[in-house]
Amino acid sequence: KLNMSTEQKITCSNIWKLFGPDEKRIIKNLDKSLSIKEVQEKTGHVVAVKDVSFSIQKGETFVVMGLSGSGKSTLVRCISRLIEPTSGTVKMDDIDVTKMSNSQLLDLRRNKMSMVFQHFGLFPHRTVLENIGYGLEIRGSKKDMRVDKSMEVLKMVGLDGWQNNYPRELSGGMQQRVGLARALAVDPEILIFDEPFSALDPLIRREMQDELLKIQEKLQRTMVFITHDFLEAIKMGDHIAIMKDGEVSQVGTPEEIVANPKDQYVKDFCEDVPKYKVLSAGKVMRTDCCDETKNLFSKKTDCIMDNLKIETLIDKLVDSDKSYPVVCNETGDLLGEIDRSIVICLLYTSDAADECDSV
């Protein structure tokens, strides 16, 4: 979705979170090969996050998804230290967040990080503008600066003209826009979203997703986005971490996960995904090319870049009975061929990526 930096903004290493009266002692002597159920039976402690490691690049949207109880919200709260991890490290810009003092942590949350929750948490006695400027207010910013910045982000989220209204006068979707604007007003480097749109009606939810994608395209902040909805995950995320029982089952781009689900749990999530919207020509092409395709390639005619999504090629391919050469976006080399039989397979089969290999 974005041209992300290769710089790592957030790095999580071997994060564990146990809930119980003696978690620090238990983790030191814990047999890490035990299942969550076995740990609870042997120690009386509940494992919410189990040995999770991943990195998030600067400027990307990293989605953490899973079913209720999978540990996704607990994990993200460990990243921000709203919950203290039992063991492991969280680094932001190579600074160990788990070793920060309370004052350092407060400074991090005021100046570098913002969070948007499912429940908006707006102050009912404050106007929209005053709610948006709250983070700047506790930071100590002057009133003129707060008003100017709040008006700027108010327009960014599509609420221009509502600055003097109160939260009770706004719809749920509008209130969530205020919550988003409040998070953006402090110019955070990192934005954390905990199922921000799950309580909204489907149409409003889609509007908010599109709004956030536009904002991200403009600002290119590092975003961590929690959801239980796989369709939302593939729409919003540059990378997705899928969680089950406190562990990360698979991390990858939406295309990598849909094309090559690691196990049945991940495959079940991919079941209803419109694969033609996720997969690119390079993922579903045939690597053996016919003479006609080779001839087209030699003439540099009708070549299709390997990174183009099938969704953008449907009209071209379905209306033609010929095969098209698929070329590498970076080098221009011939990689394979694609034709309408592959597109039709993607449109009408559930395990499209697998079945198209045999077309």
Language model features by range: what are they?
Residues 348-353:
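Conserved small/polar residues in nucleotide/adenosyl-binding loops
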Residues 28-38, 95-96, 137, 144-161:
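Conserved ABC ATPase "signature" region
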Residues 80:
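Helix-to-loop junction immediately C-terminal to a conserved catalytic motif
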Residues 166-170, 174:
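Conserved ABC ATPase signature
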Residues 88-96:
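Conserved ABC transporter NBD signature motif
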Residues 185-189:
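A short, proline-enriched helix->beta-strand linker immediately N-terminal to the Walker B motif
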Residues 245-246:
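Conserved ABC ATPase "signature" C-loop
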